[in-house]
Amino acid sequence: MATEVHNLQELRRSASLATKVFIQRDYSDGTICQFQTKFPPELDSRIERQLFEETVKTLNGFYAEAEKIGGSSYLEGCLACATAYFIFLCMETHYEKVLKKISRYIQEQNEKIFAPRGLLLTDPVERGMRVIEISIYEDRCSSGSSSSGSSSGSGSSSGGGGGAGAR
């Protein structure tokens, strides 16, 4: 477990050197936070379509849960007004709790699914909730397989940029 976390930290440090694929927000149902489940061709040889779609659908479900207005959200709002929002100094909102759950889920997916395949999933919060960023790394563990190095997908995702070292 400790070596997996160490490897994830190494991948994050070298994120600016990797090819990046961006999964855009899906506004087909309005402005609710959800991401497109369309499988990017750059990931074709790296991860199974089903695993990718399952991950994005799970994230979309978490974001729907975070934005759901229920009794607890209503009570939070009432308490916030009654205490001039001081209540939030000692209490997390429902939205913050779900965002933490999402961060844990992304960490788990990186450890179990993405990192072993040379991929790194970035929390959408780190990108302003605009995109899911997936960094693609060259195969360091496999012996001489250069088939993934000659993929034609590197030009279509180079519009990302150099802002990956913020953490």
Curated annotation (Swiss-Prot):
Palmitoylated by ZDHHC5. Palmitoylation is required for the maintenance of ZDHHC5 at the plasma membrane. Expressed in brain, but not in lung, nor chondrocytes. Keywords: Cell membrane, Golgi apparatus, Lipoprotein, Membrane, Palmitate. One of its GO terms (molecular function) is enzyme binding. GO terms for cellular component: Golgi membrane; palmitoyltransferase complex; plasma membrane. A lipid is attached at residues 78, 81 (S-palmitoyl cysteine). Its main location: membrane. It is found in: Cell membrane; Golgi apparatus membrane. Residues 142-155 have a biased composition (Low complexity). It comes from the Eukaryota. It is a lipid-anchor. Residues 156-167 have a biased composition (Gly residues). GO terms for biological process: protein targeting to membrane. Residues 140-167 are annotated as: Disordered. Play a role in cell adhesion by regulating the plasma membrane localization of the palmitoyltransferase ZDHHC5. May be involved in protein transport from Golgi to cell surface. Shares an exon with the neighboring tail-to-tail oriented gene CRTAC1. Belongs to the ERF4 family. This is Golgin subfamily A member 7B.
